[in-house]
């Protein structure tokens, strides 16, 4: 359902809330915030949110501040954390099994959420999927770090991403093609929980779940490199499958399904057909109207 809520900051947040039938007060379900990229809205992530709900995970696709139905204020990452706070307060959500996934700028929100939580925030996530943007590899002094602690983290880095994974700032030279990202020091450090890549001899195995015990919990790291471009992520059944499968495994989805078991792409297809049908109707309506006395003189 479409929602609009006022956050603790006094701002309006718009969103699409997907609640599976299995989520009840007696049997609270895991939940995840789904965050769109820059210049997009919550609807662009509806396929991912819907597939999470089909697996028994409560999903909230938000409009970031400055987008869609949310308050038109300067962009900041607190909107994603506000979304987590909203989910944690729902009686049918298990606040100990929260996750987040985001694409592009939404992926940066995932990293920001961990920073908010580590600074004493009231809620935290157990798992996240970062897509279409680099995670944090180093601290401000350049030291390699595990910025995500014991949280499970999956990264989806498109081989032909036109914005990220080249090892440079937005205005600087590229140090590698995105398709070669898995062989970089950054990727090696990510899957090895922030270890200095100079000490890592093995190459990164794409699709392998790396595990390490941190703070008494087995944390996971996973890297996927699908053959696609940056913007295709929100429509790609492949990326959607990677996202929902990781979250369903990490959060313990009540109704696990295979990665290819999806309806989201079918929904997008019929939405496109509906758009075509609307234009066909408009053209037909014009032809009908010009045959009436009122418009015959045109």
Give the predicted meaning of each segment:
Residues 2-263:
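Soluble extramembrane regions of membrane proteins in the secretory/endomembrane system
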Residues 262-298:
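Core alpha-helical transmembrane segments of integral membrane proteins
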């Amino acid at each position: 359902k479409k929602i609009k809520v006022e956050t603790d900051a006094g701002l309006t947040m718009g969103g699409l809330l997907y609640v599976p039938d299995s989520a009840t007060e007696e049997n609270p379900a895991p939940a995840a915030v789904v965050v769109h990229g820059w210049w997009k809205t919550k609807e662009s992530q509806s396929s991912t949110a819907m597939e999470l709900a089909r697996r028994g995970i409560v999903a909230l696709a938000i409009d970031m501040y400055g987008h869609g139905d949310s308050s038109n204020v300067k962009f900041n990452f607190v909107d994603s954390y506000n979304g987590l706070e909203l989910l944690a307060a729902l009686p049918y959500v298990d606040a100990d099994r929260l996750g987040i996934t985001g694409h592009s700028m939404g992926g940066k929100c995932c990293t920001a959420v961990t920073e908010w939580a580590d600074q004493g925030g009231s809620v935290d996530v157990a798992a996240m999927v970062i897509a279409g943007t680099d995670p944090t590899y180093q601290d401000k002094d350049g030291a390699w770090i595990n910025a995500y602690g014991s949280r499970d983290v999956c990264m989806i880095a498109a081989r032909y991403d036109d914005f990220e994974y080249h090892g440079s700032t937005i205005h600087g030279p590229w140090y590698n093609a995105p398709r070669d990202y898995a062989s970089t020091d950054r990727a090696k450090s990510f899957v090895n929980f922030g270890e200095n890549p100079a000490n890592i001899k093995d190459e990164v195995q794409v699709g392998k779940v790396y595990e390490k015990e941190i703070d008494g919990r087995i944390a996971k790291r996973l890297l996927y490199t699908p053959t696609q471009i940056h913007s295709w992520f929100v429509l790609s059944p492949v990326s959607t499958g990677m996202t929902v499968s990781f979250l369903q495994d990490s959060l313990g989805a009540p109704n696990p399904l295979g990665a290819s078991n999806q309806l989201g792409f079918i929904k997008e297809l019929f939405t496109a057909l509906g758009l075509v049908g609307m234009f066909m109707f408009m053209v037909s309506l014009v032809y009908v109207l010009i045959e009436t006395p009122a418009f015959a003189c045109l």
